[in-house]
């Protein structure tokens, strides 16, 4: 797959809230737990800050990421939605992940994803 085919796969093989509304919602955390287990509980391998709330999450997240990066930390930032390119959601030290990273990730793990039928939110 090339990058365009990969992002089309992500959008078309999973329920996307922005496209179909509330029917994309999946009750429960079973898929989240299964994905967490599959990836070896990656959140336990680094310090993280989760920013939540109604308004201002994006600007707060980007500001905090810039402050931490300026102080010498390696900073990963996940935000949504994206405006143009899916990779806008996933940045490391302010740079979008490479297209090839997204392609390789999906190709390497899609055999696990497909029978799970995760939502777009759960998968990304």
Question: Each PLM stretch: what is its role?
Answer:
Residues 1-53, 60-62, 66-71:
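Short functional linear segments
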Residues 22-29, 34-37, 41-44, 70-124:
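ATP-dependent carboxylate-amine ligase catalytic core
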Residues 57-61, 84-87:
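Short active-site-adjacent helix-start/loop capping segments
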């Amino acid at each position: 797959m090339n990058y365009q085919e990969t992002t089309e796969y992500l959008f078309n093989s999973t329920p996307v809230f922005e496209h179909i509304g509330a029917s994309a919602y999946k009750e429960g955390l079973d898929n989240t737990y299964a994905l967490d287990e599959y990836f070896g509980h990656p959140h336990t391998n680094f310090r993280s800050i989760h920013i939540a709330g109604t308004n201002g999450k994006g600007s707060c997240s980007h500001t905090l990421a810039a402050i931490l990066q300026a102080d010498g930390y390696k900073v990963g930032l996940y935000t949504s939605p994206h405006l143009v390119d899916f990779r806008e959601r996933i940045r490391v030290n302010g740079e979008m992940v490479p297209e090839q990273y997204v392609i390789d990730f999906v190709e390497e793990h899609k055999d696990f994803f497909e029978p799970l039928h995760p939502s777009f939110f759960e998968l990304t």
